[in-house]
Amino acid sequence: MSKHAATPERPEQTPVPHPDRTLTVWEDGVELTFTFADCMKYHGPGFPGGVAHAFAALGRALPVLAASSAGGRVERRDITVRTPFGGPGARDTFELVTRAVTENRYNVLPELARTERGNTLARYVFELSTGDATVTCVLRNDGIVADEFIELTGKPDKTAAELAHLEVLKLQMRDRILERDPAAVYDVE
């Protein structure tokens, strides 16, 4: 039996905005392309918002890293990720695309949080490095993450109704992220 058997009933799935968007990395001369659907299949249904955050951060960072890489290619196994965001959806997306988790190049560092941005935005920071290039993706303050979502995720002893509502909030956040270009979700530093 799955340890997740007690999760709430999931809301009806809605179409994913821009399902044709892809992330491209390279491994030993072979081009690898991933869609959001690929990332969700790897992660499972639990945290579509976290998957969308990582997908957008990668979509923002990879072109910048490619511009500073030899041949314009980013080798997936050369990417290091540092973030204060510990969510499993983001972690699994970075693992699928970069293999950074199993190869110890994925680091969750709470001290990277931008606490001056407030509780809602503080942890949405992703630093990606390859070679001498580093890109830091910082979530735009544009209503992408609802305060209600942060408050409800942090609430202990959620009721069944609150858990069901949290599932809806996750899908709404996923859609707010994916209906925008990654540059409209994350700024780069």
Per-range role (PLM):
Residues S2-F47, V51-E189:
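Non-transmembrane, aqueous-exposed alpha-helical and coiled segments at domain scale
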